[in-house]
A protein has these predicted regions:
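Interaction-mediating elements
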Residues: 21-146
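Bacterial Sec-dependent N-terminal signal peptides
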Residues: 1-23, 39
């Protein structure tokens, strides 16, 4: 029993050490080309403060980029954005689906979208008033959290 427990602890420690190697850099060349192009297209003024490269269990990478204006952008292993958080500034309008923009304009005319996250089920946006709105893949409103 002690031998099995010792082996289990050793295996867990080895696995944990293997994936504790997140890399933090300022070198934009560490990002996939798609991610670099995205940043250059939508965020021309703020510079990259740092990039955190996380390696997953199967070796896939994800990238978390912090810009000097505190904007945070997450990218998947292919360099496609998954999350853009501009804190209290507006997310670039070109990133927001038309139906989502229209819904926010009609129902929250005084608010700006400060964060957008896209996933398999659709899009979630956060407004400056901290309301969170969820939309399905077709851009239809699903729910709201405050």
């Amino acid at each position: 029993m002690k031998k099995v427990l010792s082996i289990l602890v050793l295996v867990l420690a080895t696995v944990q050490m293997a994936f504790a190697g997140d890399v933090i850099t300022r070198d934009a060349k560490q990002l996939p080309l798609t991610a670099r192009n995205f940043i250059n297209q939508y965020f021309t003024k703020p510079q990259i403060s740092h990039i955190k490269i996380e390696t997953g269990i199967l070796g896939s990478k994800s990238y978390e980029v912090l810009l000097t204006d505190r904007t945070e952008i997450d990218f998947d292993s292919n360099g496609n954005w998954t999350d853009v958080d501009c804190k209290k500034a507006a997310v670039p309008a070109a990133l927001i689906p038309v139906s989502v923009k229209e819904y926010v304009k009609m129902n929250f005319p005084q608010e700006i979208i400060t964060k957008i996250e896209r996933g398999r089920s659709g899009v979630e946006v956060e407004l400056a008033n901290d309301y969170s709105l969820k939309f399905n893949k077709k851009g239809q409103f699903v729910s709201m959290d405050d």
